[in-house]
UniProtKB/Swiss-Prot annotation:
Residue positions binding FMN: R129, A130, S131, Q257, A258, G302, K317, P318, I319, A320, T321, R343
Classification via SUPFAM superfamilies: Chorismate synthase, AroC (SSF103263)
Keyword Protein biosynthesis in record: no
Family statement drawn from the similarity comment of this UniProt entry: Belongs to the chorismate synthase family.
Details of cofactor binding: Reduced FMN (FMNH(2)).
Enzyme Commission no: 4.2.3.5
Pathway(s) this gene product operates in, as recorded in its UniProt entry: Metabolic intermediate biosynthesis; chorismate biosynthesis; chorismate from D-erythrose 4-phosphate and phosphoenolpyruvate: step 7/7
CDD domains referenced in this protein's UniProt entry, alphabetically: Chorismate_synthase
Protein name in UniProt: Chorismate synthase
Biological function: This reaction introduces a second double bond into the aromatic ring system.
InterPro entries (UniProt xref): Chorismate_synth, Chorismate_synth_AroC_sf, Chorismate_synthase_CS
Keyword NADP found: yes
Top-level class of the enzyme under EC nomenclature: lyase
Length: 397
């Protein structure tokens, strides 16, 4: 099973990740990882930090001659901004001058609770690890899972359907055409937009909304649409709660900073309708397996993949750091005070969509590995093809 851990602070020397459980024999290039890191850095509404960083991953272990060797892969992403923080973020040396403590928490952030939980007198340590900068390490780590899935014919893609009130959550008219070519085709089309939207009109409105929010010292969230194509039926399980695929996918998405809601298929719309208007009727194409004319379940029934495209939706709240700060208080003096201001983005929904693609990749990869088993790529792919052949036998006349 694939699992990964990340380490590092937002303004420390580097972010690190260790990825364990990748099968041996998987061909990996630096571009496979660095392309995903570059995608994460893009998007209209990002702050000044992205002008400093040029994220690239150094591979320190687990790959030899361009192939995984079955041992843990260690990745490191340099923080170029570290040179500006060597005093404030010194690891051992006590600074000669006093570093002012941050004592006014930001509403909506980890500041207040993190400070109390870990016994800090300064919010800085909370800011450093709670920061979404950590997701650079996650994107690098999960890029390897995306490579593995791609080798199995499984693709992940996303686009942004709304930012603030701009855009629509109704499916784009071009969606089916793009997904027919695979979810990565959809992602490439979205990448051509500075806000990762598919409709030019929506993009224009979103950019205007971001500009207005920035001018007012405010921030914007949005909704991300995710799709996974090429997934065979039968991944996941209804047998135990921790093997339910929809639960694992939802947990992965909610783990992203500022993501506060997840939808599978058209779940919230379904909740307002009778079952006869919700469940996807089954038809049999003789010799070619089951067919559904709708996909309101989002490709998952009974917590297992049903052979359709997986559709997920994630809601990202507006970023908690406001240039026109909300009311707060000083944790030391307990006096009322406007909340702390930290360098931040106005809108990071496009970046979040790339992160969302990343974090669901190990979930699908592990569901596949639980089905096939295997320690090297060749045997896994052989078993996958055999499994697909077994599925097809059920629908032969």
């Amino acid at each position: 099973m694939i699992r990964y851990f990340t380490a590092g602070e937002s303004h420390g020397p580097a972010l690190s990740a260790i990825v364990e459980g990748l099968p041996a024999g998987l061909t990996v290039t630096p571009e496979d990882i660095n392309k995903e890191l570059a995608r994460r850095q893009q998007g209209y509404g990002r702050g000044g930090r992205m002008k400093i960083e040029t994220d690239k991953a150094d591979v320190l272990s687990g790959i030899r001659f361009g192939k995984t060797i079955g041992s843990p892969v260690t990745l490191q992403v340099e923080n170029r901004d570290w040179k500006n923080w060597t005093v404030k973020m010194a690891r051992f040396d006590t600074p000669a001058e006093e570093i002012p403590a941050i004592t006014v928490p930001r509403p909506g952030h980890a500041d207040l609770t993190g400070m109390i939980k870990y016994g800090f007198e300064d919010i800085r340590p909370v800011i450093e690890r709670a920061s979404a900068r950590e997701t650079a390490a996650r994107v690098a780590a999960c890029a390897l899972a995306k490579v593995f899935l791609r080798s199995a014919g499984i693709q992940i893609g996303s686009y942004v359907s709304s930012i603030g009130a701009a855009g629509k959550t109704a499916p784009s008219p071009r969606l089916h055409e793009l997904l027919d070519a695979g979810a990565e085709t959809l992602a490439e089309e979205a990448d051509a937009s500075s806000v990762r939207m598919l409709e030019k009109e929506h993009e224009t409105h979103a950019i205007a909304a971001i500009d207005k929010a920035k001018e007012e010292g405010d921030t914007l969230g949005g909704i991300i649409e995710l799709f996974i194509t090429g997934v065979p039926m039968g991944l996941g399980s209804y047998v135990q709660h921790d093997r339910r695929l929809d639960a694992e996918l939802a947990a992965a998405l909610i783990s992203i900073q500022a993501v506060k809601g997840v939808e599978i298929g058209t779940a919230f719309e379904n909740a307002r309708k009778p079952g006869s208007q919700v469940h996807d009727a089954l038809f049999l194409r003789k010799g070619d397996g089951p067919e559904r004319k709708t996909n309101r379940a989002g490709g998952i029934e009974g917590s297992m993949t049903n052979g359709q495209i997986i559709h997920l939706r994630a809601a990202m709240k507006p970023i908690a750091t406001l240039m026109s700060p909300l009311q707060s208080f000083d944790i030391r003096s307990l006096d009322a005070h406007l909340s702390h201001i930290e360098r931040s983005d106005t809108c990071a929904v496009p970046a979040c969509s790339v992160i969302a693609e990343a974090v669901i990749a190990p979930v699908i990869a592990n569901a596949l590995l639980r089905k096939t088993g295997g320690d090297h790529l060749e045997e896994i792919l052989e078993r996958l093809e055999a499994y697909k052949a077994d599925i097809a036998k059920n629908f032969q006349p």
